[in-house]
Amino acid sequence: MTAVKEERQHALLSASSAHRWLECPPSARLEESLPDTTSSAAAEGTIAHALAEIKALNYFYPADMSKQKMSRRIAKLKKEELWNDEMQGYTDVYLDFLKAASIEYPSKPYVAIEKTISYDNYAREGFGTADCIMIGGNTLHVIDFKYGKGVEVSPENNPQLMLYALGAMDVYAMIYDIQHIKLSIVQPRTGNPGWTWELSKEQILLFGENVKHVSALAWEGKGDYNPGPEQCRFCRAGDLCRARAESLMDLEAAENMLPPLITWDEAAMYLRRGNGLVAWYNKLKDSALKEILSGGRVPGYKAVSGRTTRVWTDRDKAFQALNDAGYPDTVLRETKDLSISQIEKIVGKKEFTELAKDLVVKQPGAPALVP
């Protein structure tokens, strides 16, 4: 957990933010000028990563992480406010992947868990924490555990994992002749038990050469701003970035198009350019409200009280008074089934599957437009 925090605090060109600064070099320094905030989802992910680390260490290094020590560590994690029992099942999926990956080697591989990796040869003062690194023969395997479920992450051309691979090749060059690289992401909450992409030493080194040029620009805060859905999604400067605002607002140029009805080719262009417009607008509104509430000024806007709601001051006492007046609970309360996901969360994924696997079907979702 500490290593993750250090990366956020000190690595300007961090591996976890590489998908931003490699696409939009000036964004690294721009983000540096803004306060970093941690969402509840990120905090939840930190707990899940700590649990995954404990389990992996117990399996690969039981002398250092005995069952007793593991139990004590997990008991401590369970006291965290955002702890959820379903983390146990999801981290087991990750551990199963690590076990399977390790036995693919002809002999026992070297395994590093939560390894701090420097790739300073490619990006100045760049480092990050790799969840798991395995090396055996001439094969390097970088494995990353993702606890998020909102956005599925692919290992293919994944800059975070590729930077870890470059750093690992430098660190272990004197011991291993690495020629083959595997990059894997385990993201169980999206239904992904493990997705692997493979590349050669030549391919990863070519990526590294490209990184050197872009990272030099990013370090100096130079280069061109390049707004886009992927790099802007989690950028701290995303809602106030001038380049992004101008890119999105250029959609208003439609009035110059003739004839009055746009073609489907033009519609496709607007769909691409408008991707992220609503999310950006809502984030901008939130930032403006925070500015006003903190004493700042946003011309033409003010903060007002939202819609009022009524709440009980003493719910139990209120219901007792209503019961005494002749209104039973059957009138005052609703009874409804929990959703399948809620029931699975209570019962546990494994037991739920055993009890109800033949009684649950997946209905096709409504059609959705994707690029």
PLM features per residue range, with description:
Residues 1-140, 180-182, 193, 274:
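Metal-dependent nuclease catalytic cores that hydrolyze phosphodiester bonds in DNA/RNA
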Residues 272, 279-371:
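Extended, charge-rich alpha-helical segments
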